[in-house]
Swiss-Prot record:
This is Alpha-methylacyl-CoA racemase. Belongs to the CoA-transferase III family. The lineage of its organism: Eukaryota, Metazoa, Chordata, Craniata, Vertebrata. A motif (Microbody targeting signal) lies at residues 380-382. It is found in: Peroxisome; Mitochondrion. It comes from Homo sapiens. The modification N6-acetyllysine is found at residues 58, 87. Pathway: Lipid metabolism; bile acid biosynthesis; Lipid metabolism; fatty acid metabolism. The gene is AMACR. It catalyses: a (2S)-2-methylacyl-CoA = a (2R)-2-methylacyl-CoA; (25R)-3alpha,7alpha,12alpha-trihydroxy-5beta-cholestan-26-oyl-CoA = (25S)-3alpha,7alpha,12alpha-trihydroxy-5beta-cholestan-26-oyl-CoA; (2R,6)-dimethylheptanoyl-CoA = (2S,6)-dimethylheptanoyl-CoA. Monomer.
Amino acid sequence: MALQGISVVELSGLAPGPFCAMVLADFGARVVRVDRPGSRYDVSRLGRGKRSLVLDLKQPRGAAVLRRLCKRSDVLLEPFRRGVMEKLQLGPEILQRENPRLIYARLSGFGQSGSFCRLAGHDINYLALSGVLSKIGRSGENPYAPLNLLADFAGGGLMCALGIIMALFDRTRTGKGQVIDANMVEGTAYLSSFLWKTQKLSLWEAPRGQNMLDGGAPFYTTYRTADGEFMAVGAIEPQFYELLIKGLGLKSDELPNQMSMDDWPEMKKKFADVFAEKTKAEWCQIFDGTDACVTPVLTFEEVVHHDHNKERGSFITSEEQDVSPRPAPLLLNTPAIPSFKRDPFIGEHTEEILEEFGFSREEIYQLNSDKIIESNKVKASL
């Protein structure tokens, strides 16, 4: 696998960090997740392919344990606000002095500098500060919070994984690690580069929800079907639009020009009436195999059984019969080989990991006795 041999230490946090580390694990990295004592959940979320160690970083001896781990690791991933790691004597100046090859990835909401860097926030706040939230929503309505995919996972976790991989590549030339300041505000803003670069085009001249790509166009939106399901339409190009009109049983010469924005509301109503006449399955029979850019809106239950996804093996099933997406992208020479085992219990591998990093049995016993670490072998055997 592409990242085979790379050792990652992930400090537990909310979803963006675990996702970032899972991506690295899926592509071959050995990921140790450092969980906090008394964690709320027995099982790590987004823990595929990882091992879990419970360590109290608030105690100086716990911080010393992490320093030993980082001396023999390639990457440290930390999800805290500015100043937290420095307060624990675990800042990049210390850890990279002890291991100059260490890549120190900092994944936060607002970044390591600026007036918001020490403030709390969530996906919707990062979207708001990036400007992207102002573009999301229906005409005449408030901007609405989409699923927390855009800032947390795309602008945060995935962008951080990209930064780590670029830093690993740079290290092959320089021999040195570096600090990565990945944050969800700037990551999301970067994802919106197309919006920024096209602001002066007519593409975005109308208010939110009335433009071609934000639900304003009748040929780029969703429609309810007779059975209460939905079809997604994205027939932008004229040749695809003609196939849409044909599939709907309409005639182009009886409709306004496709790009007549003044007529879009009436056209949407007409299209909605037509889509409401047939079920989702019936519309699939009409549009499947065509270039009309019309597809069913699938639920999580349906997507696994869709022919295209089954043919490509786009979803995988774990030993516990949990279904999740196959890692992407598909590398033909060094594809990801995700773990099919269950996610680890919190602290399941504490002693095993410490032994691998050179801790003696006596040291591990003492750390356990002093509540610096926790080992949950009993839970793991249930």
